[in-house]
Amino acid sequence: MMKKAKLIFLGSAFLSLCLAGCGAPASEGSSNGGANSSESSIPAEEDNRVNVFVLSGQSNMEGSTYWTHPTNGTPLLENYFEEAGMDDFERVRDGIPNVLTTYYGFYHPNGWTNAHTASPDTSTPEARLTPNFQPTRVGMGVSDKGDNPNPFFGPELGIAYTISEYVDDDRPVYLIKCAFSGSGFTNGNYANGDPDWDSRKDDPRESLFYLLKTYTQKSLDVIEEEGYQPVIRGFVWHQGESGGGKPDYETSMRKLLGDFKEEFEYYAPDQDADQMAFLDCTIYDGDSPVSYKNRDTGRIDTNDAKWAIANESDDDLNFCINANHEEGGLGLDIGNDSKGGFNTYHYNTPDAFKLGQAYGQLILDNYLLD
């Protein structure tokens, strides 16, 4: 089979397709049509495998975009649905029942002791690490401000909206989201010595990777307790605003990806870590007045590192969404509070949803739903 392009340029044609309802070609919908597909020895009627995607990174993955404005009550996402001609906002408002999400994360001044979480029990830091899968809906983003309802959402929403049509109700897709605002690969990106993505550390007070692998394993255990066999089809990443311009970004990212695959190889397709996809996205390259971390040289170096990983010649399963304003990308915008982009670094409401749709379309186009 012809290899898929590693660097994904999703422009206006993609958006037109998505706004009409993203989907894989009907003739290519079977799991044996893709380069990464695997044959199962389990008869279809006895097959209890379910697809799992682990979402991680920093605040734009954690979900720092308003679906409803907490100050003036503007229904930003609902308005976008109407403007785009989509008449099913209630799906994302009430929950998509065949794509289930659990989430955990924090913004570094609060640390792991005060993480926002899907867990109904927030009495202790350990209790906050308890997974709680729910139909994917608005309000699964960061909320450390006591807002009720939670006004934020992340890429999980667009992913679920895009893939749900291709998911059996009795074999839901599970999204495990574990992401941390402001996080980078070295302690310097987190104030006051708070944790970073250094996977050599093994303490929740120091290592975000420790929290990621702990929360992921707990979530997989829950899926197994529900009678399913979880298969991690992809590691979905959005990070780089913290760490832009660091000369070792590519090395650090490769190590984190390799460590994650090694940690969860048992749950990979055919228990082969090389069959676990990696879905990344470039960081913002537009003209909004963001800091030096992701502008000019820092921004370019970080995106170049992402493209290098996505274009590995011996790997069919590394992908990078081109969200850039240049080079024919999606042109996603950030930082306009009136349009839903909380403070300086975060996607506006339409673009945060489009980002999720782009991840979802990658999943469909590359046959990652077995």
Where do the language-model regions lie?
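Bacterial N-terminal signal peptides that target proteins for export
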Residues: 1-9
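Hydrophobic helical h-region of N-terminal Sec-dependent signal peptides
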Residues: 10-15
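C-terminal motif of bacterial Sec signal peptides marking the signal peptidase cleavage site
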Residues: 18-21
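Bacterial signal peptide processing site
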Residues: 23-25
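N-terminal, intrinsically disordered, polar/charged segments of Gram-positive cell-envelope systems
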Residues: 28-44
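Cell-envelope and extracellular/periplasmic
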Residues: 42-370
